[in-house]
Regions:
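Short helix-adjacent coil turns
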Residues: 4, 151-152, 266-270
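Extended ligand-binding groove/face enriched in aromatic
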Residues: 2-131, 177-180
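Terminal, non-catalytic domain-edge segments
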Residues: 39-45, 68-70, 74-78, 84-87, ...
Length: 355
């Protein structure tokens, strides 16, 4: 949408990358890198790591990689190709003896992720130690494709072919048509929790960019399994309620939000319309300073037993993404490269603040 108005998106894109580079976002890794949790206890307690992109932590490192390369590709701007353009820096006042600083750019970060992927046999890079999630590796694949489009090469093709072969041992999907979620790296074993709606729709939304056949062959049964009918033709998605004692007892609408995104990506306009209708009828949408969003609301269900929960991730991002996306949006981004002719067309390339 708005292909001739890059100025509308350029500054917000830069601010989002700057926010992602803030230590408030990435310093959690020092704690998570020590492991010794329910799914990585076999590794024992590991030494803490400050560098948030050198090993594992793919959910964070891949978003930085793909965002920087996507910025370069969409705006034809090598801003993050400069040495040190992606620097992770913390300067504490009362501890740390000078702090920590890790300098990268879009090329060196892409190379680091590529070699990790190779070292792991293309199965994927772990998020938390020992936990290789299918979902979390998809943004890295998008980043590899953007790198290919900007600099040439075929990294994305190599990685996706290797990924399919590596996951053939476990299955990208289960026999029942739901997506597998993660493999424990040390044990080389598939963890098989009950199917999760968010996992089906989150992975489906992303992997559609390079493997649309597996998504579109399974989405109809997945949406039929998770949807619940609601008044006036609307519908909601059965939420994945964590067992007691497994993480903080927070409520959310991730399953609902990712179902909307996936419906938009696969072109299921009927499901998308029904989900958005439910959100507008029952999720208390708000207009504030030009922004339309759904405010946080705790508690899983209303007094009718229907989904009531809302969280910032869903209310601020996922439902907006679902509204703005076009059918096969990520797939087209991945497979239909912009040409030099696109950038030669007249365009709005700059604008004043506040417009």
């Amino acid at each position: 949408r708005l292909p001739a108005a890059p100025a509308v998106f350029r500054a917000p894109f830069q601010r989002l990358i700057e926010k992602m580079l803030s230590p408030d976002v990435w310093t959690y890794w020092r704690h998570v890198s020590t492991g010794n949790g329910p799914m990585n206890k076999s590794l024992g307690e590991l030494p803490p790591q400050w560098n948030p992109v050198h090993d594992d932590n793919i959910m964070y490192s891949a978003y930085i990689q793909s965002m920087a390369l996507l910025y370069h590709y969409l705006f034809d701007d090598p801003k993050y190709a400069q040495p040190g353009a992606l620097t992770f820096k913390i300067e504490p006042l009362y501890w740390g003896d000078g702090g920590e600083s890790f300098e990268y750019d879009e090329k060196s970060l892409n190379q680091r992720l590529y070699w990790q992927m190779v070292e792991k046999g293309y199965l994927g890079i772990a998020c938390e130690p020992n936990c290789v999630f299918q979902i979390c590796n998809q943004p890295a694949i998008l980043g590899f494709r953007m790198h290919d489009l900007v600099y040439g090469g075929s990294i994305a093709e190599e990685v996706t072919e290797g990924y399919k072969q590596a996951w053939s041992e476990f299955g990208i999907t289960r026999e029942n048509g739901h997506f597998n979620i993660l493999v424990m790296e040390k044990e080389h074993e598939l963890l098989e929790p009950p199917p999760q709606g968010w996992a089906d729709f989150w992975l489906g939304s992303l992997i559609n960019m390079w493997n649309p056949e597996i998504v579109k062959s399974n989405f109809p049964a997945q949406i039929a399994h998770w949807r619940r009918d609601a008044p006036e033709g609307s519908m909601w998605i059965e939420p994945s309620v964590k067992p007691e004692g497994f993480g903080p007892p927070l409520t959310h609408a991730y399953d609902f939000g990712w179902a909307a995104v996936c419906a938009s990506e696969v072109g299921d306009a009927d499901s998308l319309d029904r989900l958005l209708k439910y959100a507008d009828m029952f999720m208390d949408p708000v207009w504030d300073n030009g922004a339309y969003f759904y405010p946080r609301r705790d508690g899983w269900f209303d007094d009718q037993g229907r989904l009531a929960a809302m969280d910032p991730h869903t209310g601020n991002a996922l439902l907006g993404y679902a509204r703005l996306n076009v059918p096969d949006g990520l797939n087209k981004l991945y497979n239909n490269p912009l040409t030099k002719a696109h950038f030669a067309q007249p365009a709005l390339v700059d604008m004043s603040e506040g417009i």
